[in-house]
């Protein structure tokens, strides 16, 4: 990556040809039919039982529901329907970490072993908290299947050695964000699930977002379906709460994205915590790696989004460059995050300058390109 590419990102301009001309938004102008024309063919093609799409433009929300929560019960999808949001959960974990930072309890430049003495003398003497928050620790994607307890997990971390120099490669990692959650919870002096469910989520006004779905809400928890159309549900294993464990509905998630765009104001500390997750720390070949969010200069083409969300980005280490100094949160940017579990698919985007946010939720796993393409088609219709 050369300096010219970095400059292009800094100036917020496109570095590849733009596939369409974007115009400013005058009003919320999507009809039900326009959304149907994009979502219904996708559902048919991918055999999706149920979907929700929430859109916010200039502070005005519209939520569209399709199909059923479960093929067995045939209960229609509604505002209350809960979906597994997979790795979109990682942005919540990053926000909890930046909250701890604002409280003076966490320093992102410190080594991980500074906060976890049991890891002193390990590779984590040279891994910073920021490395965990930006997928640049070198830790692998999945927790090894034989690790079932915290003691086993810590033993794994103690022995772990990176394959590449820390901070030189982006390796998308549940083990990394999981460890970020462990460090954050320790510094906040409460279990991670408690910090998320009792401290952060209520502070953001997210009343139907959970790690553990309460009994009273179980009837709204959609049944997920895998690639083979078999019913599946998330089994929360170790580091699940920190890395991919949240369930939420379209209404809560569009609120979360509106908070990210400052369309909705929350307490100053939490607004600052959310804003800090938009800091640009590393440059990949396609996007800026923020703290779990990924951002692109706006306007952005569909081809660039597909390139940045290609499978290799999650499955193989990618060379990155540290941005010095880190980029302040960019308003003229397209922020996105995918989320998946075996039976659910999520895609969330927001563009602060345009005050547009979209979240797409389905109770079947579908390929990422299909999610991005459908979302981009919605965006084109909003922006026409």
From Swiss-Prot:
Residues 1-29 form the signal peptide. The active site is at 87 (acyl-ester intermediate), 172 (proton acceptor). It is an enzyme of class 3 (hydrolase). It is found in: Periplasm. InterPro entries: Bact_CellWall_Synth/Modif, Beta-lactam-related, Beta-lactam/transpept-like, Beta-lactam_class-C_AS. One of its GO terms (cellular component) is outer membrane-bounded periplasmic space. Substrate binds at residues 337-339. Its main location: periplasm. Pfam families: Beta-lactamase. Its EC number is 3.5.2.6. One of its GO terms (biological process) is response to antibiotic. One of its GO terms (molecular function) is beta-lactamase activity. Belongs to the class-C beta-lactamase family. This is Beta-lactamase.
């Amino acid at each position: 990556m050369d300096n010219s590419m970095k400059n292009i990102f800094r100036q917020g301009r496109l570095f590849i040809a733009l596939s369409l001309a974007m115009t400013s938004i005058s009003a919320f102008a999507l009809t039900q039919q326009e959304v149907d024309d994009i979502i219904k063919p996708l559902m048919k093609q991918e055999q999706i039982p149920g979907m929700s799409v929430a859109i916010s433009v200039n502070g005005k929300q519209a939520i569209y529901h399709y199909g059923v929560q479960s093929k067995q019960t045939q209960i229609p999808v509604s505002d209350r329907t809960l979906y597994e949001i997979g790795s979109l959960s990682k942005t919540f974990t990053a926000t909890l970490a930046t909250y701890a930072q604002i409280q003076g309890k966490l320093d992102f430049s410190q080594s991980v072993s500074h906060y976890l003495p049991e890891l002193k003398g390990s590779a984590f003497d040279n891994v910073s908290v920021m490395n965990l928050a930006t997928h640049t620790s070198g830790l692998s994607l999945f927790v090894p299947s034989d690790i079932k307890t915290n003691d086993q997990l810590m033993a794994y971390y103690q022995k772990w050695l990176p394959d590449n120099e820390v901070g030189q490669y982006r390796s998308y990692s549940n083990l990394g964000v999981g460890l970020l959650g462990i460090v954050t919870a320790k510094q906040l002096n409460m279990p991670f699930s408690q910090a998320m469910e009792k401290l952060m989520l209520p502070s953001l006004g997210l009343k139907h977002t959970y790690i553990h779905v309460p009994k009273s809400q179980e009837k709204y928890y959609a049944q997920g379906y895998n690639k083979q159309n078999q019913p599946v549900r998330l089994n929360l294993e170790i580091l699940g709460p920190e890395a991919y464990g949240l369930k939420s509905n379209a209404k809560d998630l569009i609120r979360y994205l509106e908070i990210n765009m400052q369309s909705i104001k929350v307490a100053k500390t939490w607004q600052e915590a959310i804003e800090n997750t938009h800091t640009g720390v590393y440059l990949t070949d396609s996007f800026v790696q923020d703290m779990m969010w990924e951002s692109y200069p706006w306007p952005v083409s569909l081809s660039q989004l597909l390139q940045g969300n290609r499978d290799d980005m999650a499955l193989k280490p990618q060379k990155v460059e540290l941005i010095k100094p880190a980029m302040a949160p960019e308003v003229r940017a397209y922020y996105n995050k995918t989320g998946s579990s075996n039976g659910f698919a999520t895609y969330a985007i927001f563009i602060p300058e345009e005050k547009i946010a979209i979240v797409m939720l389905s109770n079947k796993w579908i390929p990422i390109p299909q999610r991005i393409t459908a979302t981009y088609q919605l965006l084109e219709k909003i922006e026409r």
